[in-house]
Amino acid sequence: MGCDRRELTLVGAGLAGSLLAILLSQRGWKVTVYERRGDPRIKGYESGRSINLALAERGRHALRAAGMEQAVMAKAVMMRGRMVHGLDGSQQLQRYGRDDSEVIWSVHRGDLNIALLEAAERTGATIHFHRRLHTVDFDAGTARLIDDRDDQGHDIRFATL
């Protein structure tokens, strides 16, 4: 067996980065991920983003492809529509679809990110936290990352970024 394994360096271990790490690792890629924030499994999830995330069929399809749909949907809450409150005190439900087959689901963003991080590591991805991208030289295939805990620079080589 030769050295045919494709390598990818990802910057960002949020929802998209973690999901991509899972999908590529499952397909035999050697994936290394660098994330600016600390590990949310250690210090808790901190983000300025909304607490919950609305998950539609397209998102469920991506989770299904990664083998994560069942675990995530076990904690999801169905949302059939939005409630409109009139000035006169009336309330009207505006459904997202025709029936309960056309709904969106509410999931906790932090819990979803942690589940995806854990799955990415289980599939073989390596994740480095506290590494903020500073500079990239695509021609040389190098990048400089800064550790936010001590402002030290770390130079890496990458095949694909």
Residue ranges and their predicted role:
Residues G2-E7, A56-L161:
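Conserved N-terminal helical subregion
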Residues V11, S25-G48:
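Glycine-rich FAD pyrophosphate-binding loop
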Residues G17-S18:
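N-terminal Rossmann-fold NAD(P) dinucleotide-binding loop
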Residues G48-S50, E102:
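Short, solvent-exposed beta-strand edge segments and adjacent coil->beta transition regions
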Residues L53:
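Conserved phosphate-binding/catalytic loops and adjacent sensor/switch elements of nucleotide-binding enzymes
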Residues G14:
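Glycine-rich NAD(P) Rossmann-fold beta1-alpha1 loop
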